[in-house]
């Protein structure tokens, strides 16, 4: 009987009961044991009551019991076999490894995505290039159209550039109009006479210094008698008489200009008859060309001051009635100043297009 009772007592003594008895024999509380083992009081209580936590792995549970046994001086070899019978070790669940084919599928999908992305980038670049090319072609066509219009205007004017004159410019005297003399006999002015007038006007200083006194005027410069019907050359005589007022007072009656003969100085063109003589007047435009450029300038009255192509290194001075409307084929090929102030063309240069602007607006 005693043997059976001892066996039942041994079976009933679980690891938790033995640990609790050893703790009580040492006079330790559950709180003290929890602090020494760095565990929760609830964990110590579950160990003494042989309650295995569901969320706690069996390996950790066995480790807690071994630490508890060392603390209360119990042999581990006596507790572990009982623990294995009571709570066998559970096999850990191992997740199955994924196949390498999944990685290949991801790579294949990423490859398609990158190909589609590159396709979109190439389409965007192609559209951008096509848009730029169309704008470039439109600008070139517009410049060519302007050049054709300028050439047509020049051909309509007989191949001569548009004259640049103002209200104060002198008119050119006709070269083939006959000059009337006394007795109704016309004295034709030949091309030789016209060239003589021009030469005498451009060399007025030399003519003034070389004119003799009234007492020594050569007879070859005198107008013939009124009953003469042969044409004479009167250009040098008229020019000399009007340049020398004192000499004309002492000329004989036969040398006095006849009624109907022009006595005023012949209007002569300046050295640059196509351009206004004054470049510093109010409303003047000065353009310095660094490269070949097509240009058209129209003043406030609608007059075309210039239309054509200027070569690099040229300087163009224009004067008219402000404001001016300018059309420039290549804005980067010139600099413009109006009344001494530079005109800003940077926005047209950056845009790389034909410049259309108005200068001199008050």
Swiss-Prot record:
Q: Which GO terms describe its cellular component?
A: plasma membrane
The protein's location, in the record's own words, is: Cell inner membrane
GO biological process assignments: regulation of cell shape
Tell me which residues form the DNA-binding region.
30-49
GO terms (molecular function) for this protein are: DNA binding
**CDD domains for this protein:** HTH_XRE
- Provide the topology term for how it sits in the membrane: Single-pass type II membrane protein
Does the keyword section mention Nucleotide-binding? Answer: no
Compositionally skewed regions (Polar residues) per UniProt: 223-242
The UniProt regions of compositional bias labelled Low complexity, in chain numbering, are 193-221, 246-259
Domain text: The helix-turn-helix (HTH) motif in the cytoplasmic domain of the N-terminus is involved in the formation of spirals to maintain the rigid rod shape. As this protein is anchored in the cytoplasmic membrane, the HTH motif may contribute to protein-protein interactions to form the RodZ helix, which is localized beneath the cytoplasmic membrane. The C-terminal domain may be critical for determination of the rod shape by probably interacting with enzymes required for synthesis of the peptidoglycan layer, including PBPs in the periplasm.
Q: What does the protein in this record do?
A: Cytoskeletal protein that is involved in cell-shape control through regulation of the length of the long axis.
Q: So what family is this one in?
A: Belongs to the RodZ family.
The name this protein carries in UniProt is: Cytoskeleton protein RodZ
Q: Which organism is it from?
A: Yersinia pseudotuberculosis serotype IB (strain PB1/+)
Q: Which gene encodes it?
A: rodZ
